[in-house]
């Protein structure tokens, strides 16, 4: 084993190294969420906007599309796996508190792993419903874009059909609220892990974390709420 490989192995197995990897993979996912939200909000522009956006990735070569999906999947799995590892190690090393009120951690940080696992369960369901499109017959969800010249799957109709189910919308909204709690602590942790942490700047990045989480989550929630209220139909 050469020195470089040994250094890499030492880094990825150390507590600090894994925290940095969690922060970097978390940053990738945070940025992905922003892009995903921007695409989702195109539904307010009407069927043409959202269907054109959704058709874009599917116009790519199949191998390239699944390569991107696989890359995101690997980033997500690494993030979840290392987070659980660090949480379990931290719990094992920490002595139990005699009094609960001595715990100074925020609710977001204390329940980080649970909100994350809730989001994971939701993600599996979300992929099953909207990426694999299980239960949606392509023959009934076909439309045309680009002035009727390109045939594509009707994502607009699929979203309206899905969120017209109150229970589906309720589960989505609950998961997004869990995501807010997760993002609030996660974004704060990214700043801390990369060394941007001082008493002067801490209130600023705490505000950024809360604001970012709120914008992302309110944006996602606006879609099912608008469907249920008949704004999107």
Regions found by a protein language model. Give the residues of each.
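Membrane-embedded alpha-helical bundles that constitute the cytochrome b-like, heme-associated redox core
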Residues: 1-233
């Amino acid at each position: 084993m050469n020195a470089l490989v040994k250094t890499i192995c030492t880094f990825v197995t150390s507590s600090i190294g894994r925290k940095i990897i969690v922060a970097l993979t978390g940053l990738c996912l945070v940025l992905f969420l922003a892009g995903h939200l921007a695409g989702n909000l195109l539904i307010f522009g009407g069927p043409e906007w959202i269907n054109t956006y959704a058709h874009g990735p599917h116009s790519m070569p199949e191998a390239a599309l699944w390569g991107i999906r696989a890359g995101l999947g690997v980033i997500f799995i690494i993030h979840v796996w290392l987070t659980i590892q660090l949480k379990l190690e931290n719990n094992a090393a920490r002595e139990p508190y005699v009094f609960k009120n001595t715990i100074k951690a925020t609710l977001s940080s204390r329940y980080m792993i649970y909100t994350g696992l809730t989001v994971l369960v939701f993600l599996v369901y979300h992929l099953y419903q909207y990426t694999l499109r299980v239960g949606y017959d392509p023959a009934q969800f076909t439309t045309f874009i680009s002035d009727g010249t390109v045939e594509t799957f009707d994502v607009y109709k699929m979203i309206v059909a899905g969120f017209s189910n109150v229970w589906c919308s309720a589960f989505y909204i609950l998961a997004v609220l869990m995501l807010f709690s997760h993002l609030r602590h996660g974004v704060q942790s990214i700043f801390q892990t990369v060394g941007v942490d001082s008493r002067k700047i801490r209130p600023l990045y705490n505000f950024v974390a809360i604001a970012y989480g709120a914008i992302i989550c309110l944006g996602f929630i606006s879609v099912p709420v608008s469907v249920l209220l008949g704004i999107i139909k």
